[in-house]
């Protein structure tokens, strides 16, 4: 027995020591031939070309391409289900269980098989080979890692099968959502994928797209004048502007069904199978008796929506059984209705816009996360087709420190547990120079494929690729932000957070800045210097906006060393902003203008402002806009002091300009009087031309409201006039707002409002 054990041990040792299969070796002739089926799909042929291209970049060896119509080479990399694959494996039907995107990597020396169906499986398998054994990585359109190698080899015992967790994996960050080849290298699959990349089953109609389609189905400009009953009844009025549809009106159902069927007839032959029927991107659900009764019984305003969409889907299914009608569980329709279950061909897209993103949905203590957990669970148990529209940026300020890394993987695991099969993540970002957004999107792509991939292993690789010898410094920075205390129960980290609001403590920001300065110094003059420099953007941006860039009415001297440090940060930001590809600072024009003006103003200063000023005058660039930000704009105005003003168009309905008091350096115990220089377009004497007040954005309540009596608003006066508001003692979250007035009729446009400037006067 002892002799047998020794022999077996020796045999296992020999097997374990089997030499790797060499695919290409620098300085030698090609070791392998890449073989595809003679009738290979365009995607399989592209997979072969990608493997050939990257192996040549890595080893300077160009492997020949062949098909299985030719004799099997002595050493082959077989892509897809070639006629030789089953024989080499000793198994038939080797790819059936892999689906369109799954793959199996199998070494059978001297051959290597990359198995997959005729879809993207072989292509994804090629990228896995290149990442795993070649050290390749594609982080952004401008930063990829393709190491030069002496030899490219794979283990002789390689045998691994992978299938994606989600059938649709999409995000819209630079490259991932706008360059198909790049997205495919990260195992994403986009609606735009053409034949070369395996096409897609998930294309949406170009008119009835993913979201907010009511106004396209029943345009108010076409129907409201003759049929106001088609539109939502709110507070006793049918609304033309910012309206939804009356979903219990049979004519609305007929018109929508006809339009959906017309769109399907036009786009179905092009391979489109998804059509959106969903509310517009605001509130104002219909409150008519019929709609109110359906929603009352369903205990949710999604009751009328799902019942309505079910009726359309039922009609569609008769002719197009493979078509899906998608609608939104978003805002007021997120709560699942009681007793109304979506049909088989209805897809419900769940949205996470209200969440706290400092932690994953299951982990966060924020009240909205608890509600989302409940709602997702009920939708999941309904058995309907589920997709998710997730959010992974701070849209209020793209470069604000917003450490949502603790939510990325956990949320995807949560979505999988609820039965979600399709995920789209909105990751609008600050431009290609934003290293941290690139890293965030790379992580998302990895976890959309497999949310169980180890975070530390991924980040280790990512930080070493980006920062080289400074990787440990960046780990220290990353852990500092992740572990820093935050009161997310009271102040959740939402996706429209306030750069001036409660968040990371100033001591954390100072320490973070010092760590990244050390990292940049460590790699100065190396290939990693640019990434280390760009990695400082979020800390610099947050410190500048919360610190020295704030106009001051304080009685206290500024800390000179701190001021100089923040001034240097502003100069670093301006250096990046002035590049051709620059930085996109915010989701809307007003925010971009305000942030840009303050950063540039600080960068040009030589000394801080002297304390003790009694009056602070701010031009229009210091104001930001609230939703809908697209209608808030800057205009030439000869009546304004500097010839420019903010225009709030009356037809916009809800457009408002804001000045966050935390964007100013004010004393905590100070008393101040805000004044505004405003004019409005001609209006009747019974029309309120504008409103103003103070609103707390953290606690979501009105602090002061300055009406006509309080501020002596003159009706119908077109010239600028200063209006003095009440005394305020601003607290965290307090914000001065100036908004449109009231025409007395919800369907009549309010007067246009021009805002020239704001003045803050210190009285104590």
Where are these regions (language model features)?
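Acidic, contiguous N-terminal accessory segments
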Residues: 9, 15-104, 152-159
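Feature activates predominantly on carbohydrate-active enzymes
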Residues: 47-50, 54, 93-307, 314-321, ...
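Structured mid-domain segments that build the active-site/substrate or prosthetic-cofactor binding neighborhood
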Residues: 247-254, 262, 267, 367-470, ...
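Substrate-binding cleft/loops of secretory-pathway carbohydrate-active enzymes
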Residues: 326-354, 400-404, 432-441
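Catalytic domains of carbohydrate-active enzymes that cleave complex glycans
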Residues: 444-668, 672-674, 682-684, 688
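Beta-strand acidic-aromatic groove motif in beta-rich domains, primarily in extracellular
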Residues: 681-700
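Extracellular carbohydrate recognition and processing domains
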Residues: 697-733
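Short beta-strand-plus-loop segments that form exposed binding edges in beta-rich domains
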Residues: 739-749
């Amino acid at each position: 027995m002892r002799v047998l054990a020794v022999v077996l041990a020796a045999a296992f040792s020999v097997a374990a020591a089997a030499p790797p299969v060499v695919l290409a070796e620098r300085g030698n002739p090609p070791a392998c031939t890449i073989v595809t089926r003679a009738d290979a799909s365009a995607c399989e042929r592209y997979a072969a070309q990608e493997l050939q291209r990257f192996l040549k970049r890595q080893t300077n060896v160009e492997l020949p391409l062949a098909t299985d119509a030719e004799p099997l080479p002595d050493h082959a990399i077989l892509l897809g289900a070639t006629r030789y694959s089953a024989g080499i494996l000793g198994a038939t039907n080797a790819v059936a269980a892999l689906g369109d995107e799954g793959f199996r990597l199998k070494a059978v020396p001297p051959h290597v098989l990359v198995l997959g169906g005729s879809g993207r499986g072989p292509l994804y398998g090629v990228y896995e080979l290149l990442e795993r054994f070649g050290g390749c990585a594609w982080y952004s359109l401008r930063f990829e890692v393709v190491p030069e190698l002496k030899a490219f080899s794979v283990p002789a015992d390689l045998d691994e099968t992978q299938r994606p967790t989600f059938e649709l994996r999409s995000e819209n960050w630079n490259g991932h959502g706008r360059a198909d080849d790049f997205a495919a290298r990260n195992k994403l699959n986009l609606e735009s994928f053409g034949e070369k990349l395996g096409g897609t089953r998930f294309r949406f109609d170009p008119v009835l797209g993913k979201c907010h389609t009511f106004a396209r189905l029943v345009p108010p400009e076409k129907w409201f004048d003759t049929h106001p009953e088609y539109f939502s009844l709110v507070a006793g009025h049918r609304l033309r502007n910012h309206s939804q549809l009356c979903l219990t009106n049979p004519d609305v159902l007929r018109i929508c069904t006809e339009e959906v069927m017309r769109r399907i007839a036009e786009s179905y032959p092009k391979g489109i199978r998804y059509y959106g029927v969903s509310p517009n991107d605001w509130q104002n659900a219909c409150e008519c008796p019929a709609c109110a009764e359906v929603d009352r019984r369903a205990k949710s305003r999604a009751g009328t929506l799902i019942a309505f969409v079910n009726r359309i889907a039922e009609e569609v299914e008769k002719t197009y059984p493979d078509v899906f009608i998608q609608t939104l569980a978003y805002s007021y329709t997120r709560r699942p209705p009681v007793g109304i279950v979506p049909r088989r061909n209805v897809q419900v897209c769940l949205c996470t816009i209200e969440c706290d993103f400092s932690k994953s949905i299951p982990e966060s203590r924020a009240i909205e996360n608890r509600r989302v957990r409940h709602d997702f669970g009920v939708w999941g148990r309904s058995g309907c087709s589920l997709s998710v529209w997730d959010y992974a940026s701070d849209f209020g300020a793209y470069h604000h420190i917003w450490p949502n890394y603790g939510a990325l993987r956990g949320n995807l695991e949560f979505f999988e547990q609820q039965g979600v099969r399709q995920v789209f993540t909105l990751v609008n970002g600050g431009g290609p120079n934003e290293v941290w957004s690139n890293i965030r999107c790379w992580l998302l792509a990895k976890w959309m494929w497999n949310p169980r991939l180890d975070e530390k292993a991924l980040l280790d690789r990512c930080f070493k690729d980006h920062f080289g010898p400074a990787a440990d410094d960046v780990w220290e920075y990353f852990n500092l932000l992740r572990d820093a205390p935050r009161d997310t129960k009271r102040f959740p980290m939402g996706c429209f957070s306030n750069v001036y609001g409660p968040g990371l403590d100033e001591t954390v920001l100072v320490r973070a800045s010092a760590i990244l300065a050390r990292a940049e110094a460590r790699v100065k003059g190396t290939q990693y210097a640019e990434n280390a420099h760009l990695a400082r953007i979020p800390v610099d941006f947050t410190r500048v906006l919360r610190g020295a860039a704030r106009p001051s009415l304080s009685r206290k001297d500024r800390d000179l060393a701190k001021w100089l440090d923040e001034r240097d940060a502003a100069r670093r930001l301006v250096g990046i902003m002035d590049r051709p590809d620059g930085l996109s600072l915010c989701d809307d024009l007003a925010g971009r203008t305000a942030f840009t003006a303050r950063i540039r103003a600080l960068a040009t200063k030589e000394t801080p402002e002297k304390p003790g000023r009694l009056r602070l005058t701010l031009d229009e660039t210091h104001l930001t806009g609230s939703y809908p930000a697209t209608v808030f704009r800057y205009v030439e105005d000869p009546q304004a002091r500097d010839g420019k003003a903010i225009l709030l168009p009356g037809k916009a309905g809800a457009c408002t300009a804001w000045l966050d008091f935390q964007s100013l350096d004010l004393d905590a115990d100070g008393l101040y009087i805000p004044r505004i220089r405003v004019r409005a377009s001609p209006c009747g004497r019974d029309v309120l031309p504008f409103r103003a007040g103070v609103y707390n954005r953290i606690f979501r309540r009105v602090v002061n409201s300055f009406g006509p009596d309080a501020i002596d608003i003159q009706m119908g006066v077109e010239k600028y006039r200063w209006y003095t508001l009440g005394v305020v003692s601003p607290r965290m979250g307090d914000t001065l707002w100036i908004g449109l007035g009231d025409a007395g009729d919800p369907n009549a446009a309010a007067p246009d409002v021009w805002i020239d400037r704001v003045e803050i006067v210190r009285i104590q």
